[in-house]
């Protein structure tokens, strides 16, 4: 924020601050700014998610699920963090230097240590996994066999629900020592906190599925969509219906969010294995595991790599190419589909389609964030700043995702201007609505380059 804007805030704050202090004792922040009960619950969940340590080692849910990085972490983002960030607690807390994390694999490949089969034999009974994002969960959690959370679909204890997920996360990642004793090493979330955390997580990202095919304009992305939807060629839509996390109606494997053994564990020369660090095989769902892993949504994929449960593949093109690999085609899932055989240009086309729908989702989120900003006056300034910072990050993602595939340079230019305008809005107190409205217009211009206006 500029020095002049800082001066203006102080100058105009005196009277409102007095009124604010008179009433704050009887109104929580959530109640004051979010009179709707569900909105207040979501806001409380947000504050817990990013600030509550549960009397543990200093980590919060937001330590690994970063709002500014698509609710996940990756090596490039990790490299920007200071050495005293709670993510690196195993490096500076002597009680957690053994059997809690592997700092080398975390920093180099974005992997965290999970004891999904229990906390006996900590030295051997573990796996190294990437951090999944927590976006669009209303569309991805439910299955015929119950809720699916985490990479293998069994990430939550007790009833396996999203609400219960935080219980397991606190015990796994927040503990002060490997003993994991409630009261001494951490406290579990209360029922009210679990309700709020669930509400917040369910509010993140898409609330409904796409309806494919979309009226895309880009030649390569349009071809990629056709391959994606073709049940004889790409076969993608059978398990990622509408590019989501659920099986297509009539899928012989079942309905809803399904688990599959796709052979990712059988990939040769996985990056983390090349280090010589201990990497026990990951047996997936259950204890002992059955080798299956959960189906993720693909709308959010292009800007949330690396890919698969072990971060084995860096790029979206590489992730699509995996389904041509013997590891997939000889797996139970690949055998059940009769194999997939795409040529190099078809792989690029499917990846282009995934890049475009990801950028379109970023634009949708940005417009939503911008339209929700600039309406709270002085007391909502900080909340506006959070929204605008998020919009800036999402705009950067959209630009990078498109540019990374050489797609829609005109849209990239519009997004660059939208980002500049959003930054101006974030540094302006009284004229911000002007910049916000112009940024929204630029996002719509970018979207119009990629997809027909009637959509």
Report each predicted region and the residues it spans.
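N-terminal secretory signal peptides that target proteins for export/translocation
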Residues: 1-9
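Sec-dependent N-terminal signal peptides
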Residues: 11-20
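N-terminal signal peptide c-region/cleavage motif recognized by signal peptidases
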Residues: 23-25
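Periplasmic c-type cytochrome electron-transfer domains
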Residues: 29-455
